[in-house]
Curated annotation (Swiss-Prot):
Source species: Mesorhizobium japonicum (strain LMG 29417 / CECT 9101 / MAFF 303099)
Family recorded in the similarity comment: Belongs to the ABC transporter superfamily. UvrA family.
Pfam families linked to this entry: ABC_tran, UvrA_DNA-bind, UvrA_inter
One example GO MF annotation: zinc ion binding
Protein name: UvrABC system protein A
CDD domains for this protein: ABC_UvrA_I, ABC_UvrA_II
PROSITE patterns: ABC_TRANSPORTER_1, ABC_TRANSPORTER_2
SUPFAM superfamilies: P-loop containing nucleoside triphosphate hydrolases (SSF52540)
Function, in words: The UvrABC repair system catalyzes the recognition and processing of DNA lesions. UvrA is an ATPase and a DNA-binding protein. A damage recognition complex composed of 2 UvrA and 2 UvrB subunits scans DNA for abnormalities. When the presence of a lesion has been verified by UvrB, the UvrA molecules dissociate.
GO terms classed as biological process: nucleotide-excision repair; SOS response
Length: 973
């Protein structure tokens, strides 16, 4: 029998791997590291995970396989010792608005069960609990009263409804009932006065008169059953000798029955408020699901929000006059109608078109936006052809847009109007997504919506304290459910997500956050003997929380799993049981194993660049001198209050490299992206983005452009590639079209595009492959047998430059392209910027869909580098070191500092201390995440941050600045 202490890989050749042989210890924490593009993901995901998943899925029936995504068999000779594999990547966040942190982690499913089994419904009218009781419980409740207590047992058949009820009273008499209580007075049925049908009445039937004593159980049960049948599940026991004083009786108190003249006990065999009639169907878990019509708020369909016209988007800048376009939907229209409408309103409400919108009276602003109500205004219109006068009410800009949005059948018009809409909390469910019936059910004074609004840290405490508020029976029911909930909350705490709320939409999470959520779910599942493959779980995590994440990964290992992590984080590498260092460089220059073994063995290996950075032999240099703000110009953000920001005022010196730091959930993205970027792009670039709440931003006049270089894909189709995105493909096509052979044939640049007819291969339409659907086997992509994967037809491929066709050029790496086009500056310079940002290894025509987030971000950066510098641009980057090795970080910093040296301002959100230590200025937000964050903890140079006791960033930075002396800005080579 084979010994499976190792995971043995033989002859791995996927992508750039060069026939790799490797033995990995099972049940260990293994970190794969190395330069970007060196083959880490090819080995971990495309070989080991793909084969583990493929073998598991192949063991299922053909029927089951058709529902599962099948993996291609990787290019590898043999893998032994493989377990079923689970991959946790960053890309798979659900953008579905119905997906929340609670639903993704399954905590919400357990909460629904808890509220269905232990929750107590409360009447919205009285605030009192509504309980469903059996007849036996009702009998016991009466018999528990003091012996000799005199009671009337009543059936409330009419509660607060208009009518005469003659027919109903006659029916009761026929059934043998003799007395009723009508509007607070007892009558023989024959003597009931005629009731006025215009008024609301209360009628209770007297079913029995009782004096409490021990032998009453059988009679009482019969009488209660009779009352419940008559009153559709309700019964009342009224104390004959305990009248209420006048302040408590029906006439003077809201929602009470006029018959409530004495103290009474209300019984309900349904969940129904005996006072207001508010009823709840049987309480089941589906009542608390906002994805089920049984529980979802009918107004917003369980989304918690509605799109409505936003006055702040209709009038984006109140400092603009009406003539200059303060009313945005009307600003670009050439029709005289809108100006003449405003002139007429101006006469009626005493304003001129030259007035700024903010200087108009509240009444005038309201008339423009929401209409004149019942007040009529005289309008005079002249369109050049005819002139006419009319007196009418004015609808208002907002109601007009809302009406047109509902009535139009034009998709274009709908889209145009939607630019002035924003999501607002649903007015009925207040954003909780559920029906009133579901929100009436409470545990410990909170309904399910209020519990999900808490941060994970606070929810953990609430669920821990909950058993003390429950009775013995409730605790017995809840014990297992609470255990599951608390375990999952604890795991979320452990991976540094304690600041998130359970109601947070999962589409708004960063890649690192969503990956750690799935990691917490996996730990909750408690599987053993599994192979986990993770892709940089430390992304977006502050150094402070790194230890908790590593403890989580070690826990997965300790319960009997093999954990493979693709990671660049120094702590993760040093805590690994086994490290595999890929290299020596990227792309075609990588794909080999440079070093493997314990972290110490890798550090001792002279060939390992990773080892040199870990041991301190190589380092990202700390600059000797920090830049000052150019000409003392600064951006000042005043009173930022978005999300959890607490009135933050901070400065960013222009012409410097600034890092925004702080623990996860501290408010960095809200401050930089939601506030600064959106406000700046609105003011400078004229975008329609709506910034988070803030007072003002000073200093924007010194900028002419603001660019957010994010990690979203550069294209969503295989036809998009680095050459098309950076604009290098246009000069390449122009160059080929200018060659003598092409001119002789009359070819234009379009001949060399694989997107249009003419030069492309029509058999595969320029894709190079043909997709064949195989149903319960994976789709097979077969190389086109006409062009053999070249994408172009034979005639186009006949045009050669230096012996290479256009297809050969697209297949080159960027590095090869720079040398090949050395004499063609238009192409060389664009490709050279890609090489500068460390992407020399990618292919010029590589499909955009195969690029990682970090690679996409650096391609965007390269595009910016190739533009003509104005020296007045603000560049914003969110964690640009994602997916970067120490050595790549050093190269990236050179590029970012080059942008700053041109006079631009670069601001990054970053946790990587190697980047933070090279910054000229640091803004540290926090001190904690979520509710405990949102403050400016410190701002200044890295040295100033180190001196701030409350700053977690400062504490970790201090170690680094003390450990490594200052040097030149250049990265170590």
């Amino acid at each position: 029998m084979a010994d499976h202490k190792f995971l043995s890989i033989r002859g791995a050749r996927e992508h750039n791997l060069k026939n790799v042989d490797l033995d990995l210890p099972r049940d260990s924490l293994i970190v794969m590291t190395g330069l970007s593009g060196s083959g880490k993901s090819s080995l971990a995901f495309d070989t080991i995970y793909a084969e583990g998943q493929r073998r598991y899925v192949e063991s299922l029936s053909a029927y089951a396989r058709q529902f599962l995504e099948m993996m291609q068999k990787p290019d590898v000779d043999q893998i032994d010792g493989l377990s079923p594999a689970i991959s946790i990547e960053q890309k798979t966040t659900s953008k579905n608005p119905r997906s929340t942190v609670g639903t993704v982690t399954e905590i919400y499913d357990y909460m629904r069960l808890l509220f269905a089994r232990v929750g107590v419904p409360y009447s919205p009218a009285t605030g009192l609990p509504i309980e469903s009781q059996t007849v036996s419980q009702m009998v016991d409740r009466v018999l528990a009263l003091e012996e000799g207590t005199r009671l009337f047992l009543l059936a409330p058949i009419v509660r607060g409804r208009k009518g005469e009820y003659r027919k109903e009273l006659l029916e009761l008499q026929k059934k043998g009932f003799q007395r009723v209580k009508v509007d607070g007075v007892f009558y023989e049925i024959a003597d009931v006065p005629a009731l006025d049908k215009k008024y609301k009445h209360d009628i209770d039937v007297v079913v029995d008169r009782i004096v409490v004593r021990g032998d009453l159980a059988t009679r009482l049960a019969d009488s209660i059953e009779t009352a419940l049948k008559l009153a559709e599940g309700l019964a009342v026991a009224e104390f004959a000798d305990k009248p209420l004083d006048s302040s408590q009786t029906g006439e003077d108190s809201v929602n009470k029955s006029k018959n409530e003249t004495h103290e009474r006990i209300l019984f309900s065999e349904k969940f129904a408020c005996p006072v207001s009639g508010f009823t709840i169907p049987e309480i089941e878990p589906r009542l608390f699901s906002f994805n089920n019509p049984f529980g979802a708020c009918p107004t917003c369909d369980g989304l918690g929000s509605q799109r409505a016209i936003d006055p702040n988007l209709v009038v984006p800048d109140e400092n603009v006059s009406l003539r200059d376009g303060a009313v945005s939907p009307w600003a670009k229209s050439t029709s005289p109608y809108y100006v003449q409408t405003l002139e007429a309103l101006g006469k009626a409400y005493n304003f001129k078109l030259g007035d700024k919108f903010k200087d108009l009276s509240a009444e005038a602003q309201d008339a423009i936006l929401r209409g004149t109500g019942e007040r009529e205004v005289t309008f005079q219109y002249d369109d050049g052809l005819r002139s006419y006068k009319t007196t009418k009410t004015f609808e208002g800009v907002i109601p007009n847009l809302e009406r047109r949005w509902k009535e139009t059948e034009s998709a274009w018009m709908r889209e145009e109007i939607e630019r002035f809409m924003s999501a607002t909390p649903c007015p009925v469910c207040k954003g909780y997504r559920l029906k009133p019936e579901a929100l009436a059910v409470k545990i410990g004074g909170k309904h399910i919506g209020e519990v999900t609004e808490q941060s994970i840290r606070n929810a953990d405490k609430w669920f821990t304290d909950l058993p003390a508020q429950l009775n013995d029976k409730q605790n017995e029911i809840a014990v297992r459910v609470l255990k599951e909930i608390r375990e999952r909350l604890r795991f979320l705490n452990d991976v540094g997500l304690d600041y998130l709320t359970l109601s947070r939409n999962s589409g708004t999470l960063s890649g690192g956050e969503s990956q750690r959520i799935r990691l917490a779910s996996q730990i909750g599942s408690g599987l053993t003997g599994v192979l986990y493959v993770l892709d940089e779980p430390s992304i977006g995590l502050h150094q402070r929380d790194n230890t908790r994440l590593l403890d989580t990964l070690k826990h997965l290992r300790d319960i009997g799993n093999t954990v493979i992590v693709v990671e660049h984080d120094e702590d993760a590498i040093l805590h690994a049981d086994y490290v595999v260092d890929m290299g020596p460089a990227a792309g075609i220059h990588g794909g080999e194993i440079i070093a493997q073994g314990t972290p110490q063995q890798v550090m001792a290996n002279p060939n390992s660049i990773t080892g040199k950075y870990l041991s301190g032999a190589l380092e990202v240099a700390t600059p000797g001198v920090r830049r000052e703000a150019k000409k003392n110009r600064r951006l000042k953000i005043v009173g930022a209050r978005g999300n959890n920001l607490k009135n933050v005022t901070a400065e960013i010196p222009l012409g410097t490299f600034t890092a925004v730091t702080g623990v996860s959930g501290g408010g960095k993205s809200t401050f930089l992206i939601e506030t600064l970027f959106k406000a700046a792009s609105r003011r400078i670039m004229g975008s329609r983005e709506h910034p988070a709440e803030h007072d003002r931003i000073e200093g924007l006049e010194f900028l002419d452009k603001v660019i957010d270089i994010d990690q979203s894909p550069i294209g969503r189709t295989p036809r998009s590639n680095p050459a098309t995105y950076t604009g290098a493909f246009t000069p390449i096509r122009d160059w080929f079209a200018g060659l003598p052979e092409a001119k002789a044939r009359g070819y234009q640049p379009g001949r060399f595009s694989f997107n249009v007819k003419g030069g492309r291969c029509e058999a595969c339409q320029g894709d190079g492959v043909i997709k064949i659907e195989m149903h319960f086997l994976p789709d097979v992509y077969v190389t086109c047998d006409v062009c053999h994967g070249k994408r172009y037809n034979r005639e186009t491929l006949d045009v050669l430059f230096k012996g290479k066709s256009i297809a050969d050029v697209l297949d080159m790496t960027v590095e090869e392209g720079v040398d090949f086009f050395a004499a063609v500056p238009g192409v060389r310079d664009k490709l050279d910027t890609l090489k500068q940002v460390g992407l020399g290894y990618i292919h010029i025509g590589q499909q955009a869909t195969t690029l990682s987030g970090g690679e996409a971000q650096r391609i965007k950066l390269a595009k910016e580098l190739s533009r003509k510098a104005t020296g007045k641009t603000l560049y914003i980057l969110d964690e640009p070191t994602t997916g970067l090795h120490f050595h790549d970080v050093a190269k990236l910093l050179e590029v970012l500092h080059e942008l700053v040296d041109q006079g631009n301002t670069v601001v990054v959100i970053e946790h990587n201390l190697e980047v933070i230590k090279t910054a000229d200025w640091v803004l540290d937000l926090g001190p904690e995440g979520g509710d405990g964050g949102g403050e400016l903890v410190a701002q200044g140079t890295p040295e100033a941050i180190v001196r701030e006791k409350r700053s977690y960033t400062g504490q970790f930075l201090k170690e680094l600045l003390e450990r490594r002396p200052g040097g030149k800005r250049e990265a170590a080579e």
